[in-house]
UniProtKB/Swiss-Prot annotation:
It comes from Klebsiella pneumoniae subsp. pneumoniae (strain ATCC 700721 / MGH 78578). The keyword Nuclease does not apply. Gene3D superfamilies: Methylthiotransferase, N-terminal domain (3.40.50.12160), Nucleic acid-binding proteins (2.40.50.140), tm_1862 like domain (3.80.30.20). Belongs to the methylthiotransferase family. RimO subfamily. Residues 8-118 form the MTTase N-terminal domain. It is found in: Cytoplasm. Keywords: 4Fe-4S, Cytoplasm, Iron, Iron-sulfur, Metal-binding, S-adenosyl-L-methionine, Transferase. Residues 136-373 form the Radical SAM core domain. Its EC number is 2.8.4.4. [4Fe-4S] cluster 1 binds at C17, C53, C82. This is Ribosomal protein uS12 methylthiotransferase RimO. Pfam families: Radical_SAM (PF04055), TRAM_2 (PF18693), UPF0004 (PF00919).
């Protein structure tokens, strides 16, 4: 008779944005800490956890399909994440799901796992988890989530109904995690949240402590402290508050990456008002001009929506004029699509699909030309590149201007003497509208 005890196995699916990925990492870290095995297939797992996305209709569909596949292959499924906030919608399609929780419900997920799968017998002195926790990104970069939820009520968005109002993590806790990641060899931290520039607003920017020293809970103080780690620090999801101006000098001094991901969404004052978004195009253009004077190497990424309800040709032309003037480096564009629960669905003058498509094409054609011209300016220059992949044909990396997965890449054809995580100096020899090619200096 064998005395080998069965080690419970958990299958895991993570869908959606980097913020959801961080939630998955936290759940997986807890599971591994308790001694559960995490396995890549469903058929030999004791149960499956599906961390869902519910931001847009296509994401909802993908999540429902993933749940269905897990039920078919395994039968015992726990659902969490943004779509979990809509339990009725999930139960209607998949009534056999065991349990459903909303986003960032880590303790509830673990309680459900304990209920349906026996807790492993685990020697607490045997560490199954690295100090930095389980990471789903390559070893040389990691996402650092600084807050949860959002206080804004943009009419096209349902995130606050899923993830709640802003809750900032204690700054000492955030900085301790950042230090653990840096000590583990992470070369780039990607700071994420629903609204990075609002960090600390909910706690009135109270003073926290890190290494026994007082630190204000604010985006600027956070950046100043992260700069001391000596690794790349990249800011994402930065709402255009006035105090964003205060981080530009830190970028100019090389303390954090000269990169700002700032979702502007539109340029027409009328459409911005319908979206419940702040600011005017003229004021934003003036700020961009000022930022570039302070930090000439600044890379600006933004996202926009075309075909928002009520958008006229005149409104759209304002957006194109803004693009021509702003000359942003990296731009994402989405055709407006109704999201269940979003107040924008009730607005008058919905734009026909063929008009959305036509405007999206015009937008992308213009921005691709601008992006190509911006990258062409880098030909002949030397830049730093963080290596992501290496094979027999060469290496692929990213410059300071490139976030993983959403931006471009730098191709080093024939360069095989490097490894992922290396930072190398490269001379740029060629560019298109998205990527660069170069050789190591």
């Amino acid at each position: 008779m064998s005395n080998v005890t069965h080690q419970p196995k958990i299958g895991f699916v993570s869908l959606g944005c980097p913020k959801n990925l961080v939630d998955s990492e936290r759940i997986l870290t807890e599971l591994r800490t308790e001694g559960y095995d995490v396995v890549p297939t469903y058929d030999n797992a004791d149960m499956v956890i599906v961390n869902t996305c519910g931001f847009i209709d296509s994401a909802v569909q993908e999540s429902l399909e993933a749940i269905g596949e897990a039920l078919k292959e395994n039968g015992k499924v726990i659902v969490t994440g943004c779509l979990g906030a809509k339990e009725d919608q999930i139960r209607e399609v998949h009534p056999k799901v065991l349990e459903i929780t909303g986003p960032h419900s880590y303790e509830q997920v673990l309680e459900h796992v304990h209920h349906y799968t026996p807790k492993p017998k685990h020697n607490p002195f045997l560490s199954l988890v690295p100090e930095q926790g389980v990471k789903l990104t390559p070893r040389h970069y990691a996402y650092l989530k600084i807050s949860e939820g959002c206080n804004h009520r943009c009419t096209f968005c349902i995130i606050p109904s899923m993830r709640g109002d802003l809750v900032s993590r204690p700054i000492g806790e955030v900085l301790a995690e950042a230090k653990r990641l840096a000590d583990a060899g992470v070369k780039e931290l990607l700071v994420i949240s629903q609204d990075t520039s609002a960090y600390g607003v909910d706690v009135k920017h109270r003073t926290g402590f890190h290494n026994g020293m007082p630190v204000k809970t604010s985006m600027v103080s956070l950046c100043e402290e992260l700069a001391k780690l000596g690794i790349w620090v990249r800011l994402h999801y930065v709402y255009p508050y006035p105090h964003v101006d205060d981080v530009i000098p830190l970028m100019a001094e090389g303390k954090i990456l000269p990169y700002l991901d700032i979702p502007l969404q539109h340029a027409s004052p009328r459409i911005l008002k319908l979206m419940k978004r702040p600011g005017s195009a003229d004021r934003q253009l003036a700020r961009i001009k000022q930022w570039r004077e302070i930090c000439p190497d600044l890379t600006l990424r933004s996202t926009f929506i075309v075909g928002f309800p009520g958008e006229t040709e005149e409104d759209f032309q304002m957006l194109l004029d803004f693009l021509k003037e702003a000359r942003l480096d990296r731009v994402g564009c989405f055709k407006y699509s109704p999201v269940e629960g979003a107040t924008a669905n009730e607005l008058a003058d919905q734009v026909p699909e063929e008009v959305k498509e036509e405007r999206w094409n015009r937008f992308m054609q213009l921005q691709q030309q601008i992006s190509a011209e911006r990258l062409q300016e880098k030909v002949g220059r030397e830049i730093l590149v963080l290596v992501d992949e290496v094979d027999e044909e060469g290496a692929i990396g990213r410059s300071m201007a490139d976030a993983p997965e959403i931006d471009g890449a730098v191709y080093l054809n024939g360069e095989t003497r490097v490894k992922p995580g290396d930072v190398v100096r490269v001379k740029v020899e060629h560019a298109d509208e998205y990527d660069l090619w170069g050789t190591r200096v």
